[in-house]
Amino acid sequence: MKKQIFSTLVLSIGILLPFSLHSQEQRKKVGVVLSGGGAKGMAHIKALKVIEEAGIPIDYIAGTSMGAIVGGLYAIGYTTEQLDSMVRKQDWTFLLSDRIKRSAMSLTDRERSEKYTVSIPFTKTPKDAAAGGLMKGQNLANLFSDLTVGYHDSINFNKLPIPFACVAANVVNGEQIVFHDGILSTAMRASMAIPGVFTPVRQDSMVLVDGGIVNNYPADVVKAMGADIIIGVDVQNALKKADKLNSVPDILGQIVDITCQSNHEKNVDLTDTYIRVNVEGYSSASFTPAAIDTLMRRGEEAAKEQWNSLLALKKKIGIAEDYTPKQHGPYSSLSNARTVYVTDITFSGVEVDDKKWLMKKCNLKENSDITTQQIEQALYQLRGSQSYSSASYTLTDTPEGYHLNFLLQAKYEKRINLGIRFDSEEIASLLINGTADLKTHIPSRLSLTGRLGKRYAARIDYTLEPMQQRNFNFSYMFQYNDINIYEEGERAYNTTYKYHSGEFGFSDVWYKNFRFGFGARIEYFKYKDFLFKKPEFTMNVNSEYFISYFAQLRYNTFDKGYFPSKGSNFSGAYSLYTDNFARYNGHAPFSAL
């Protein structure tokens, strides 16, 4: 009898369980689409929070540009609270530039950055010019790598905690490219590569830029992924009136919006609950803390305005009113305080012999615990050297531990640098410099500098770097000087002269804040006039030349070049002067310290 009852129970459970599972699987799938919009996309975070509070499950997510960034991070497990905290603590001015932290720059690069107010890259080939941008987006790309640790392999985005897709545009043929797989951080970077601002992402034969120029609200993409119900968050501005189209960026942006309008309207029609955020008064570049706070608040308000619509979706989805989705996240990111065990470290894009020096410079060791903060500092050190224009990394899990790979690109840049100076003596002077990293067997750099003003000058430098951070420099400089000499606040006399200098030197950077150098120099002074306030004073000065040997060192840890608040600075130089390599005017050489 007992066996009969037991058999009946087992049979009943076996019959009822598939029906129960089938009923759960029968609910409709929900997709969320997040539009592009730059800084305005901050509103997505709070809108997602309201969708969660309404008890709506999210089965798919697709986005463009900033929507791709928020959507991609949400898809791997970031909670809305984590996203909120992350965007608020970022230095967006730094992230949206290619600046390198001063502490990671070499002394030479620090001096150059302080001397010039404008630095403009110019390209070597038409290929670079066609695919260029004002910025490489290096800092932003490194942030994406930091935020996606654990997803650095080429992966299938459908296998993420929430299946994800993002949109980019291929400028080779104008086609929409939908990322369903690949390296997540690269896909997000491609989707937000604003043309003319950030350099595009090159992949195979494609040149990829911001997907907003072809599909800024990809509801069709999330539908194709399998979504039956679509919730959309749109942070695009409405088309501007004539009186608002006052600049080239305004007009170009309007042209793109008009081009995409038909596709946008079709995608809105696919949406079951459409959340349109009021972004009036804000632009794609509104990354100030106050703007971020307001945009997030407006995103939450816009989503709550659709609260009844969200609740009504539950019936369409096929879930109960008290349905609670499974918990989302949190993403266990590699924080600055958390460590991972790294078994091996590799460098892609460099000579094998350079690994030892790079390991020393990065201050990293294989078979040791390493934090994100250490990796970040290593990236700054690599980009701060004169050898590499870009540096990124991947951190992939292996059975023995993590494999850390740095991807480096040799620096073969050409730049035009401009500086301007105002003072009461010269009124104004302009400094113009052109610098090119040359593709020679031994890394080298050529620099031409001109100074326009009352005291004009020209200089040429050629630098060879046979070993990392050790270089030989050859230079020639010409200066015309017009100098007033003052006594008790009044001009006593004026002198003009021409100065020529040829120099050969060796420099060694033992430590990033310390530089030591020595060399030889030939100087020639050709004096022209000495004008005295008192006519009875006269002076005849013959032209003269010096052959000197010098040694110099500098130590600098200032946090800023001008008006530093912390750090220290020390510099010293010693020169021994002769006129025939050994003696001066028949006597022992004289020195200056």
Q: Predicted segments — roles?
A:
Residues M1-K28:
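Bacterial Sec-dependent N-terminal signal peptides
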Residues L21-T64, G72-Y380, G384-A391, L395-T396, ...:
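Patatin-like phospholipase
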Residues S154, A238-L239, S389, Q468-Q469, ...:
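Short beta-strands and strand-coil junctions in structured, solvent-facing domains, enriched
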Residues C166-A168, F516, F570:
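A short, Trp-centered hydrophobic/proline-enriched beta-strand micro-motif
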Residues D210-V214, K454, K498, A588-F590:
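Short, glycine/acidic-rich beta->alpha junctions
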Residues Q373, A378, G384, S392-F558, ...:
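Gram-negative/organellar outer-membrane beta-barrel architecture
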Residues R554, P564-K566, F570-L593:
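Extended beta-strand-rich architecture
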